[in-house]
């Protein structure tokens, strides 16, 4: 979901700087390298299901040095963002504010128990973009937000 203003920042109980790149961006298996707060991660994601709401994901922690070395091998563009965590009722929203080639884009995500679960929508939440591939981080690294036509 897109966000239209930054009220979420004052509500955040946690925030992390995230730098990430992709060794592979094909939909069947996206391979991501991420550095988050001095920790490295290697993540493999499978295809998204038909509803666009879930997919297989495997992640392994690696050293930040290993992640830095692997980022050099990644396809352009590297994603740079701050993730804010905002609790609302029983749910935690992860709100990503992007920088660099994706500056100006803010996207929120909430993990649900099942696809039809009802959740409280905060006033700062905007348009629903779930399942729209252009908003996937892997696609933002390939077709950055600043290249989109309005």
Describe the role of every protein-language-model region.
Residues 1-150:
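Phosphate-end processing signature that detects enzymes handling 5′-triphosphorylated RNA
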């Amino acid at each position: 979901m897109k966000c239209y203003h930054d009220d979420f920042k004052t509500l955040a109980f946690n925030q992390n700087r995230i730098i990430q790149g992709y060794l592979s961006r094909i939909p069947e298996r996206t391979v991501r390298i991420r550095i988050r707060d001095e920790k490295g991660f290697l993540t493999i994601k499978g295809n998204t299901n038909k509803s666009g709401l879930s997919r297989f994901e495997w992640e392994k922690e690696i050293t930040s040095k290993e992640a830095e070395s692997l980022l050099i091998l990644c396809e352009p563009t590297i994603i740079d963002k701050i993730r804010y965590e905002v609790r609302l009722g029983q749910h935690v929203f992860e709100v990503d504010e992007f920088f660099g080639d994706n500056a100006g884009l803010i996207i929120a995500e909430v993990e649900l128990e099942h696809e039809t679960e009802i959740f409280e929508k905060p006033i700062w939440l905007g348009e629903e973009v779930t399942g729209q591939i252009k908003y996937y981080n892997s696609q933002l690294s390939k077709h950055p937000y600043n290249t989109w036509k309005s």
